[in-house]
Swiss-Prot record:
Name of the protein in its database record: Sulfate adenylyltransferase subunit 2
Sequence similarity: Belongs to the PAPS reductase family. CysD subfamily.
Domain of life: Bacteria
Swiss-Prot/TrEMBL catalytic activity: sulfate + ATP + H(+) = adenosine 5'-phosphosulfate + diphosphate
Keywords attached to this entry: ATP-binding, Nodulation, Nucleotide-binding, Nucleotidyltransferase, Transferase
Subunit comment: Sulfate-activating enzymes, NodP and NodQ, may be physically associated.
Primary role: Proposed to provide activated sulfate for transfer to nod factor.
UniProt cross-references to SUPFAM superfamilies, sorted A to Z: Adenine nucleotide alpha hydrolases-like
One matching Pfam family: PAPS_reduct
Species assigned in the record: Rhizobium sp. (strain BR816)
Amino acid sequence: MSLANLRRLEAEAIHVLREVVATFSNPVVLYSIGKDSSVLLHLAMKAFFPAKPPFPFLHVDTTWKFREMIAFRDRMARELGFNLLVHTNQDGVDQGIGPFTHGSNLHTHVMKTMALRQALETYGFDAALAGARRDEEKSRAKERMFSIRNAQHGWDPKRQRPEMWKTYNTRVGAGETMRVFPLSNWTEFDIWQYILQENIPIVPLYFAARRPVVRRDGMLIMVDDERMPIEPGEEVMDRMVRFRTLGCYPLTGAIDSEAATVPDILREMLTVRTSERLSRLIDTDEAGAMEKKKREGYF
């Protein structure tokens, strides 16, 4: 991939970031701490330099993220000085909702989707930017860069608007909001090339290291804390693994890998023919799981 292509993608994303600031009164960036969010954070810092980004960064904390993710989040906010908001669905916490006790579907709905809706309504955000890409998953592949949501934060594919010649329709009706995806046209390979080119810090979990994992539901699940029950017949193995995508640790599978640097990851990716989302259990709850979640208000 040429440097010119990366600069074109960068310019497009920065244009979208500035368009959102120019046309919405109270935007926010959804900061999930992953590699795409790290790229989006970097682009936001660039887009408005030397000023700080004129919007906050919202992390929806399910209380089940990898410990290294939370430490990285706090370090980035401290070092870069951006406005970090953290929201947790306290009702879900009080009810003891979790991936082991209630399953991935209910956990995701309560602790991610409902939590996000709560935060958007509490702060009155009218546009939420996120780092989703079209090459990740089929429902994301057909979503527009500016994706209108109804008053209940739901997505209706039939209401999508044409986007021609970088002319975006940013108007929303009463109660409606907009989800905006500046990285829509990036691929996973583009993301890693840009991380290398710009020397962007990312969570160490993306790099191969020896980690304690168990094989469950066909995936290698990392034992990140004492809350993870070890089922009969399971064995905790110390394996050289890394993560292509990051979410709640009980719902995110690792891959066997020796790739310990960004160039190593780029070389490894030349042999990969599957989406990183295949290692996220929430995408396989049922047929069309991601589209169903988006209709309910998910990212």
